[in-house]
Amino acid sequence: MFHQFFGENMLRADVCNAVEELGQLLDHTGPVLQSERNAARIFNADHLFFVTNGTSTSNKIVWHSTVAPGDVVIVDRNCHKSVIHSITMMGAIPIFLMPTRNHLGIIGPIPKEEFEWKNIKKKIDANPFIKDKNVVPRVMTLTQSTYDGIVYNVEMIKEMLDGKVDSLHFDEAWLPHAAFHPFYKDMHAIGA
């Protein structure tokens, strides 16, 4: 309605299109569009959009387009602060997957048992903020890879949670190179 009232020209004049020949990140045109399509091809993705604010903003985009207030979400307890911020902003109810710690207190991997539905269900049942104990969690967010280089088998996790969670979100800020080396087969979500 806003767009219909003011029109295309007024809204386009409100953003900087300093060099039209170079394309625009906001409307995905010209060389920017060509570059995004090429990156999507390289990463074996259906679509790819450049985000210039980093993966913190990317995480928030995922959450704001997926999660509604009161939704139950499953989150890696070692997740990035942008995910915690998104939980707060969206008013979601988190269920945390707990990583291990070694004798020095360094955070390790999340044990496979934490991903088993029976254990997630126990956490849902024990959470006093969740009224519908048969709720389907809206999203599961997992840091892939962690700051310490811990990676998870994405295919195994997808298989374990198939049909149990609406969306799987792997925060791969530290793993963009995984698609380019066979060592990481099944260890990244991009193009999986």
Walk through the language-model features, giving the residues of each:
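Conserved PLP-enzyme active-site core in the AAT-like
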Residues: D27, N38-I42, T55-A192
